[in-house]
Swiss-Prot record:
Transmembrane segments: 1608-1628
Glycosylation sites: N234, N332, N450, N500, N679, N717, N968, N1043, N1182, N1225, N1276, N1366, N1500, N1547
Bias kind Basic and acidic residues: ranges: 281-299
Protein name (record): Thrombospondin type-1 domain-containing protein 7A
Signal peptide positions on this chain: 1-47
Domain TSP type-1: 57-116, 120-192, 194-247, 360-416, 423-510, 512-574, 634-695, 696-769, 771-831, 832-904, 906-959, 960-1033, 1035-1095, 1096-1163, 1166-1220, 1221-1284, 1286-1341, 1342-1412, 1414-1475
Organism: Homo sapiens (Human)
Gene that specifies this protein: THSD7A
PANTHER family attached to this UniProt entry: SPONDIN (PTHR11311), THROMBOSPONDIN TYPE-1 DOMAIN-CONTAINING PROTEIN 7A (PTHR11311:SF8)
Entry GO terms, CC: cell projection; extracellular region; plasma membrane
Residues in compartment: Cytoplasmic: 1629-1657
Membrane topology (Extracellular): 48-1607
Keywords: Angiogenesis, Cell membrane, Cell projection, Coiled coil, Differentiation, Disulfide bond, Glycoprotein, Membrane, Repeat, Secreted, Signal, Transmembrane, Transmembrane helix
Record-linked Gene3D superfamilies: Thrombospondin type-1 (TSP1) repeat (2.20.100.10)
Location of region: Disordered: 265-311, 1570-1591
Length: 1657
């Protein structure tokens, strides 16, 4: 009861609503009889009691999903939990007590905790996809024509497994790492493919030569039925054939031989052998008794030992010769047996023969596994191999089964604590070589010469070698001791990417020392003002370094001298300098007359700098200057001009420095009482200057010497840094300093200022010594391990080492050799093995007890079988194990052979003689002979030469050969240079890639029969050579740089340009031209900023001349006039204007006036001085500000004279007239400037500041500097010119093995790789990275089966027989279309006897010859082409299939019931094609044509095309078309010819063809009533309808009588009127009104040329 209640409760879980009891499930109210029936049922009471005792529950247990597995350790033992709660059946949660506690589910369970390392232990196992099953869909009907196939679904089994134990595991473990793979997938069930067969062959000949027979024709299967397609039709068709009546009686009986029985032994072998051994012992005793001679006994003993050894070898063979029998029957043409007497034959076939008892191959048990070949641990390829072997115990004899494998290998891992890691290998590199620039030079640059001081971007190389990576490698190269490095290994051991062997580098370019111009000569001063001893002084001039030199031998070692000195007398360190003269103060307080001018002075030092006045206390103070203040009516003179610049910098015998100053007359004196003006000579003064002699001295410094060790400093053995470079010690440098007189040479040192003498000694750094570091020698290369017969060349082995650090700074040189070689030890003589065959044993016949019942048998003679022993021998005859011969000695010789013990009636012949010698040319023959022996000479049957030929002939070998070239020419190949191992590292340069080479064409040699032979027979080395040229690349060639142009501005910052012109374009892969100028494609520009000193040239004016009055007052000599002065352009120097130059060099706008209007005061007038300079305008300029200049009154006017004018003159400040603003302007960047010795690399771009006036004119920078304007621009920036790195290639690899081992098409290939891609304007990589060369032609020899002979049944007409075939050695040229030609077997002597990959030669096999009247299967057809399953030419992925078939041949119709079934065999294939099948049809011949199905490759087939789309082959109409002018159409209905219309009957058949009438239409142009006739062409085109009726018009134009109806005429007239209206409207719409002609503006548009940038355009 309880169990039932629990079941009910569990069944109620999850119900949608509460279940109150069983009765609640019934519909209420129930009929009373039914209710009583329920209560009275057996068990009903129990159910009711149960419902009362245990009411259905309203509460159920609910569970959540299991949580994550938790645990301390991985694997089993984890715990996972889930939530459990009590819920009402309506879904809401309630207390746990409302549910039954006994039924509470577990909230905790054990689980498997998955960890990351479990990924290696567990994985999904994917089962194979099962067969594709169709998806059943009743709503979709299958189409009549299958296009692609039917959609299906296929499933597979998936399970999580533990990989090492191959046991299932929980899916959750595998799902932790990878989602569960798909269980099912969509698939395609292709369309059904019916069997497709070929066309029938031609009919065979009649089976009988007389009487009634059968002839047949067959076809073969092209494609088998697939995917449920229909089976194949009959492959054979028969028809009865009649020949001429038979004259004799038809042969009704045939002798039939059955198959041979299994080979068996005649008697118990042990009994027979025991009896034989007993007899042999007695025989040996008798022999030993009879032999007394000890030498004879020794010979017998050796023979016994040899026979015993042979027996030991023969234990592997155990050959037993038995016998087998067969049955011979006489059967009639219906296949029933008859008495042998019906088969009339002279000699019956033998029913017995000797045979070999079949023995299967027997092998021993497996040996123990060998140790693992890998004795170390390697993470990359951890597995090694281990081997176990077994030996042969019994060779197979007479069995087709081969022996199993004697060796088995499996992967293994070396395990245990003592396993060491395997050697790993990695690349190492040598030190980079010195940076070199010359490899980057173009051909043109290299030819230009000096390449010694190149700098800038360069290239450096290093070598790469392979070492064992897990040795203790050299960590750093920084000590003086011998450094150890790993020895180089074979490069093939390193597998990672090879490090770069080239890289770009940079050699700092030396910058030249740049100095400022010389300053002006200073005053005579002491060498040292702090030590003023003696009276010797020097006048000095100086210059400074404006750009420090870099990259030279010293910081200032390459600079010219910066100071020049001239000896002088009376030196002074300080002196007074007059600033200006004061006004002339008359003496004694008078207003005019003699007076003095006081000079305003400052104290200056020898450099011209103002200093404290106290320092000039020893100097002579300037005294006041005497002057005259003019009185009225006195002559008035101007003030003295400044002294001119000195005419010479020094004074000598022929030169003397002079300075001039002048003054002019401002006003003449009056006639009465005034002081007169002096004469003209008094208006000019000359004084000497630069009186020192022209002997200039300076200190001249030589270059700094080599840095030598300073023992006083370098005792500290430490590494220091000096200017950022590491050094091991401090050294000392010296240089020579001499005193030099300019233009003379060296003089004594006292002539030069000693205190200003440059240094002669300075400290320097001694760079660390670097010794040559070489790796240890590599291992010796291996000598040939296996011996080669006939290889007499001397083998050598070598070893090498690599320089990883070159010596530097006086380190130890590389003196030891880098390469050693020695001769290999002579290899041991090759040990070869051979089979030794022993004598054939006696011929063993079938026992007489077996053959005595056979008619014609004779005891002791007849056919038998004999065996022989074979042993394994070394080449020298020594004993060897049988396994050596099995491995090295080729196929096992035959162990048995058929033999014959001649009977009395048999023909006996001698053995064949040797072939006679060949005499004569090609075409001669040689013979061999044999003769009959004994009584055979007299027997007639033995004299039959067909059965027993006594002479054989064969053609002699012919030695006529001809050679002919084959194949294409090879690439042009340069001769390989000799590779020398140099001391030091390789320097990467240009590899020779051009010049004269050779190309090769293979030569083939053929004999007189057209068979390919070795090329040596034609006295050829295998090639035709032809010289060829690989054109050398020519780089782009530009001209030399032109001279720099003049600076574009004569004042301020401009640009200067130089250019190159294109001389020659690159060709043959030379360096391309740099990017050319966009305007002129043939020119390359280089633009740099330049600065022209605005004060370089200046206008110099002489004083104004005396004002020449134009209207002369004879009494006063005064009034208006003109005065002039000379204006010259002078070159400015530090000492002032020096030389007169052309006027165009000075600014014409700034040229001072050369003449002006003047006013000469009268004697009584006021005289004022020259106007002073204008004051500066206040910036910014505006009209409200003014500038002024002033003049001083010199002579006061007389009483009657004119008073003095205003001595101050003002003018407004106008912008760009007399007032200017100034601002900085920055030029564009120059092109990247490199050193003259650099090709590429780091350069510098410069720009310059320019001070620009507000009117746009460049002025001297001092104007902007005076205003303190900001200068925030960077004037220099670094730049990079990409280096033109030529493409660098590796050496050519060795020639590969020939792609073909023989034949005409073999090629050898060698490759090279890019080791350095080209960069910038470097020479690009050539496209030819592979070179091919034909291999020497070798004949292709192989073994080939001959054709099977017909089935031969010995001495019978039918039954079981044999067929045989031969193997022959054939030669071909390896091409597919070459027919193989048979040659002597000696050419295939070195080729393993394998045909089609099979070592077992099948030269004989049993066959069955059908008896007359038998029904039999024909031979297999050849395999069909591989055909894929495709749709619209697209493979569906089901693989290909091939098929072959065997048709049935019937010889007698009576035996059809005995015929076997035709056979079909298929196999899968992979290199198939998609084929399509289409219906083809010939042209109609009458009412019929031929229709057939054709495959896309042109084969006619049956069964490949869809039947429903087959075209008709017959188009005859029923009933026939008998009406005139009718014909039968392709739709098999009658139609009328052209020009006639059909008249149909009520049942839609053609009644008659009526001629279509002519419609007469009047023409529009002709009003005379001309008519045009028009006849409708096919007015009623036929149409096909379901009823098969011809097409008819809806409105019939013809009446029942065949005439046109009336409405047709009305329609024709209306159509004609409509046509006239349409034509008229078109004419009016298209007609254009006349317009006045406009004159066209034929201005030519500018022609735009699309310029492609080619300089040749």
């Amino acid at each position: 009861m309880g169990l039932q209640a629990r079941r009910w409760a569990s069944g109620s879980r999850g119900a949608a609503g509460p279940r109150r009891g069983v009765l609640q499930l019934l519909p209420l109210p129930l009929p009373l009889p039914l209710l009583l029936l329920l209560l009275l049922r057996p068990g009903a009471g129990r159910a009711a009691a149960q419902g009362e005792a245990e009411a259905p529950t309203l509460y159920l247990w609910k569970t959540g999903p299991w949580g994550r597995c938790m645990g301390d350790e991985c694997g089993p033992g984890g715990i996972q939990t889930r939530a459990v709660w009590c819920a009402h059946v309506e879904g809401w949660t309630t207390l746990h007590t409302n549910c039954k506690q006994a039924e509470r589910p577990n909230n905790q369970q054990n689980c498997f905790k998955v960890c990351d390392w479990h990924k290696e232990l567990y994985d999904w196992r994917l089962g194979p996809w099962n067969q594709c099953q169709p998806v059943i869909s009743k709503s979709l009907e299958k189409p009549l024509e299958c296009i692609k196939g039917e959609e299906g679904i296929q499933v597979r089994e998936i399970a999580c497994i533990q990989k090492d134990k191959d046991i299932p595991a929980e899916d959750i473990i595998c799902e932790y790492f990878e989602p569960k793979p798909l269980l099912e997938q969509a698939c395609l069930i292709p369309c059904q493919q019916d069997c497709i067969v070929s066309e029938f062959s031609a009919w065979s000949e009649c089976s009988k030569t007389c009487g009634s027979g059968l002839q047949h024709r067959t076809r073969h299967v092209v494609a088998p039925p697939q995917f449920g397609g229909s089976g194949c039709p009959n492959l054979t068709e028969f028809q009865v054939c009649q020949s001429s009546p038979c004259e004799a009686e038809e042969l009704r009986y045939s002798l039939h031989v059955g198959p041979w029985s299994t080979c068996s032994m005649p008697h118990s072998r042990q009994v027979r052998q025991a009896r034989r051994r007993g007899k042999n012992k007695e025989r040996e005793k008798d022999r030993s008794k009879g032999v007394k001679d000890p030498e004879a006994r020794e010979l017998i003993k050796k023979k016994r030992n040899r026979n015993r050894q042979n027996r030991q070898e023969n234990k592997y063979w155990d050959i037993q010769i038995g016998y087998q029998t067969r049955e011979v029957m006489c059967i009639n043409k219906t296949g029933k047996a008859a008495d042998l007497s019906f088969c009339q034959q002279e000699k019956l076939p033998m029913t017995f023969q000797s045979c070999v008892i079949t023995k299967e191959c027997q092998v021993s048990e497996w040996s123990e596994w060998s140790p693992c070949s890998k004795t170390c641990h390697d993470m990359v390829s951890p597995a090694g191999t281990r081997v176990r072997t077994r030996t042969i115990r019994q060779f197979p004899i007479g069995s087709e089964k081969e022996c199993p494998e004697f060796e088995e290998k499996e992967p293994c891992l070396s395990q245990g604590d003592g396993v060491v890691p395997c050697a790993t290998y990695g690349w190492r590199t040598t030190e980079w070589t010195e940076c070199r620039v010359d490899p980057l030079l173009s051909q043109q640059d290299k030819r230009r010469g000096n390449q010694t001081a190149l700098c800038g971007g360069g290239i450096q190389t290093r070598e790469v070698y392979c070492v064992q990576a897990n040795e203790n490698l050299l960590s750093q190269l920084s000590t003086h001791k011998n450094k150890e490095a790993s020895k180089p290994m074979d490069l093939k051991l390193c597998t990672g990417p090879i490090p770069n062997t080239t890289q770009l580098c940079h050699i700092p370019c030396p910058t030249e020392c740049e100095v400022s111009p010389w300053s002006a000569w200073g005053p005579c001063t002491y060498e040292n003002c702090n030590d003023q001893q003696g009276k010797k002084g020097f006048k000095l001039r100086k210059r400074r370094i404006t750009n420090e030199p870099t990259g030279g031998s010293g910081v200032t070692g390459n600079c010219p001298h910066l100071l020049e000195a001239i000896p002088c007398e009376e030196p002074a360190c300080y002196d007074w300098k007059a600033v200006r003269l004061g006004n002339c103060e008359p003496d004694n307080g008078k207003e005019c007359g003699p007076g003095t001018q006081v000079q305003e002075v400052v104290c200056i030092n020898s450099d011209g700098e103002e200093v404290d006045r106290q320092l000039c206390r020893d100097a002579i103070f300037p005294i006041p200057v005497a002057c005259d203040a003019p009185c009225p009516k006195d002559c008035v003179l101007s003030t003295w001009s400044t002294w001119s610049s000195c005419s010479h910098t020094c004074s000598g015998k022929t030169t003397e420095g002079k300075q001039i100053r002048a003054r002019s007359i401002l006003a003449y004196a009056g006639e009465e009482g005034g002081i007169r003006c002096p004469n003209s000579s008094a208006l000019q003064e000359v004084r000497s200057c630069n009186e020192h002699p022209c002997t200039v001295y300076h200190w001249q410094t030589g270059p700094w010497g080599q840095c030598i060790e300073d023992t006083s400093v370098s005792s500290f053995n430490t590494t220091t840094t000096w200017n950022g470079e590491a050094s091991c010690s401090v050294g000392m440098q010296t240089r020579k300093v001499i005193c030099v007189r300019v233009n003379v040479g060296q003089v004594g040192p006292k002539k030069c200022p000693e205190s200003l003498r440059p240094e002669t000694v300075r400290p320097c750094l001694l760079p660390c010594k670097k010794d040559c570091i070489v790796t240890p020698y590599s291992d010796w290369t291996s000598c040939p391990s296996s011996c080669k017969e006939g290889d007499s060349s001397i083998r050598k082995q070598s070893r090498h080492r690599v320089i990883i650090q070159l010596p530097a700074n006086g380190g130890r040189d590389c003196t030891d050799p880098l390469y050693e070689e020695k001769a290999c030890e002579a290899p041991q003589a090759c040990q070869s093995y051979r089979w030794k065959t022993h004598k054939w044993r006696r011929c063993q016949l079938v026992p007489w007890s077996v053959q005595q019942d056979s008619p014609g048998a004779q005891e002791g003679c007849g056919p038998g079988r004999q065996a022989r022993a074979i042993t394994c021998r070394k080449q020298d005859g020594g004993q060897a194990g049988i396994h050596e011969c099995l491995q090295y000695a080729g196929p096992v010789p035959a162990l048995t052979q058929a033999c014959q013990i001649p009977c009395q009636d048999d023909c006996q012949l001698t053995s064949w003689s040797k072939f006679s010698s060949c005499n004569g040319d090609c075409g001669a023959v040689r013979t061999r002979k044999r003769t009959l022996v004994g009584k055979s000479k007299k027997k007639e049957k033995c004299k039959n030469s067909h059965l027993y030929p006594l002479i054989e002939t064969q053609y002699c070998p012919c030695d006529k050969y001809n050679a002919q070239p084959v194949g294409n020419w090879s690439d042009c190949i340069l001769p390989e240079g000799k590779v020398e191992v140099l001391l030091g590292m390789k320097v990467q340069g240009d590899i020779k890639e051009c010049g004269q080479g050779y190309r090769y064409q293979a030569m083939a040699c053929y004999d007189q029969n057209g068979r390919l032979v070795e090329t040596s027979r034609c006295n050829s080395h295998g090639y035709i050579e032809e010289a060829c040229i690989i054109p050398c690349p020519s780089d782009c060639k530009l001209s030399e740089w032109s001279n720099w142009s003049r600076c574009s501005k004569s004042c301020g910052s401009g640009v200067k340009v130089r250019s190159k012109w294109l001389r020659e374009k690159p060709y043959n892969g030379g360096r391309p031209c740099p990017k050319l100028d966009h305007v002129n494609q043939a020119q390359v520009y280089e633009v740099v900023p330049c600065h022209s000193d605005c004060n370089q040239y200046l206008w110099v004016t002489e004083p104004w001349s005396i004002c020449k009055v134009t209207f002369v007052n004879m009494r006063e000599n005064c009034g208006e006039g003109v005065q002039t002065r000379k204006v010259r352009c002078m070159q400015n120097t530090a000492d002032g204007p020096s030389e007169h130059v052309e006027d165009y060099l000075c600014d014409p706008e700034e040229m001072p006036l050369g003449s002006r209007v003047c006013k000469l005061p009268c004697p009584e007038d006021c005289v004022i001085s020259e106007w002073g300079p204008w004051t500066q305008c206040v910036l910014p300029c505006n009209q409200s500000s003014f500038r002024q200049r002033s003049a001083d009154p010199i002579r006061q006017p007389a009483d009657e004279g004119r008073s003095c004018p205003n001595a101050v003159e003002k003018e407004p400040c106008n912008l760009n007239k007399n007032c200017y603003h100034y601002d900085y302007n920055v030029t564009d960047w120059s092109t990247c400037q490199l050193s003259e010795k650099a090709v590429c690399g780091n350069g510098i771009k410069t720009r310059m500041l320019d001070c620009v006036r507000s009117d746009g004119k460049s002025v001297d920078l001092k104007y902007c500097e005076a205003l303190g304007l900001e200068k925030n621009w960077q004037m220099n920036t670094s730049c990079m010119v990409e280096c033109p790195v030529n493409c660098q290639l590796s050496d050519w690899s060795p020639w590969s093995e020939c792609s073909q081992t023989c034949g005409l098409t073999g090629k050898m290939i060698r490759r090279r790789t890019v080791t350095q891609p080209f960069q910038g304007d470097g020479r690009p990589c050539p496209s030819l990275m592979d070179q091919s060369k034909p291999c020497p032609v070798k004949p292709c020899y192989r073994w080939q089966y001959g054709q099977w002979s017909p089935c031969q049944v010995q001495e019978a007409q039918c039954g079981e027989g044999t067929r045989t075939r031969n193997i022959s050695c054939v030669v071909s040229d390896g091409s597919a279309d070459d027919f193989s030609k048979v040659v002597d077997e000696e050419f295939c002597a070195d080729i393993e006897l394998i045909i089609d990959g099979n070592k077992n030669m099948v030269l004989e096999e049993s066959c069955s010859q059908p008896c007359p009247g038998d029904c039999y299967l024909k031979d297999w057809s050849s395999w069909s082409l591989c055909q894929l399953t495709c749709v619209n030419g697209e493979d569906l992925g089901f693989g290909g299939i091939q098929v072959r078939s065997r048709p049935v041949i019937i010889q007698e119709l009576e035996n059809q019931h005995l015929c076997p079934e035709q056979m079909l065999e298929t196999k899968s294939c992979y290199d198939g094609q998609c084929y399509e099948y289409k219906w083809m049809a010939s042209a109609w011949k009458g009412s019929s044509r031929t229709v057939w199905c054709q495959r896309s490759d042109g084969i006619n087939v049956t069964g490949g095309c869809l039947v429903m789309s087959q075209p008709d082959a017959d188009r005859s109409c029923n009933p026939p078309c008998s009406q005139p002018h009718s014909y039968c159409s392709e739709t098999k209905t009658c139609h009328c010819e052209e020009g006639y219309t059909e008249v149909m009957s009520s049942n839609s058949t053609l009644e008659q063809c009526t001629l279509i009438p002519v419609v007469v239409l009047p023409t529009m142009e002709d009003k005379r009533g001309d008519v045009k006739t028009s006849r409708a062409v096919h007015p009623t085109q036929p149409s096909s309808n379901p009823a098969g009726r011809g097409r008819t018009w809806f409105l019939q134009p013809f009446g029942p009588d065949g005439r046109l109806k009336t409405w047709v005429y009305g329609v024709a007239a209306g159509a004609f009127v409509l046509l006239i209206f349409i034509v008229s409207m078109i004419y009016l719409a298209c007609k254009k009104p006349k317009k006045p002609q406009r004159r066209q503006n034929n201005r030519l548009k500018p022609l735009t040329l699309a310029y492609d940038g080619d300089a040749d355009m």
